Regions:
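Acidic/histidine-rich, metal-coordinating catalytic segments
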Residues: 97, 109-126, 149, 154
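Structured catalytic cores of enzymes that bind and process phosphorylated ligands/cofactors
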Residues: 32, 96-110, 184
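Short, well-ordered coil/turn elements that cap or connect secondary structure elements
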Residues: 26, 112, 136-140
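C-terminal anion-handling pockets and recognition modules
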Residues: 28-29, 156-206
């Protein structure tokens, strides 16, 4: 797409998402925004201070290792749901979908809302395995595809920043297992914050 086409597509999808949010507010659907991120065992520096001209050093022994985070934001419920792994592959995203089966999927004798999940066109979302997994859930899960170059349309991006800048920042983790546990604890704290304080996602960025 050329520049004008991209802008038009972003506007079109942005309007569709406004309509989806209205549907969620009316109780007609559950609206989920999905994406991946990662955290490192070395410190994430949300902010730092040093005298002018000083060489700022942060202790970070060894080689930094990462933990991948697969997540969805329940837009109306304001809840972040995260699974962790050592990689960001289609199989890891499908594991997240399997968790959504338990939380949002059909259950015998229970009426559940249709679910709309917002996804970008990243390779793990458009692989054959992932598309097959999404197709198998098409009777209750609808995908809204984001255009390329439009992270601003994915509401989970702000929450990822909040998680890393306010809950995981300025810490060194001894190994991926310790970081993994810290991620899940941080998600629990963040969700508690967001349930108590409706404007917490509007705080000033670090």
């Amino acid at each position: 797409m050329k520049g004008r086409q991209i802008a038009n597509e972003i506007d079109r999808v942005g309007l569709r998402l406004k309509l989806r949010k209205a549907q969620a507010e009316a109780g007609d659907i559950a609206l989920l925004f999905a994406d991946e991120s990662e955290a490192l065992t070395h410190p994430y520096l949300a902010r730092a201070w040093a005298k002018r001209g000083a060489d700022l050093r942060v202790p970070a022994p060894g080689q930094s290792k990462k933990v991948a985070m697969m997540g969805v934001l329940d837009w109306l419920g304001r809840r972040l749901i995260v699974t962790t792994s050592r990689s960001k592959r289609s199989t890891d995203f499908i594991t997240l979908l399997q968790n959504l089966d338990l939380l949002y999927g059909p259950k015998p004798g229970i009426r559940v809302k249709p679910v709309v999940i917002v996804l970008d066109n990243g390779p793990i979302h458009t692989s054959k395995a992932t598309l097959a997994a999404l197709a198998a859930r098409a009777h209750w899960l609808t995908v809204e595809w984001l255009p390329k170059y439009a992270p601003e349309l994915n509401d989970i991006e702000v929450v990822w920043h909040d998680l890393k800048a306010h809950h995981l920042a300025h810490q060194t983790f001894s190994d991926p297992e310790t970081l993994d546990a810290a991620i899940h604890q941080a998600v629990a704290v963040l969700n508690l914050e967001r349930s108590r304080h409706p404007l917490v996602n509007q705080r000033i960025s670090a």
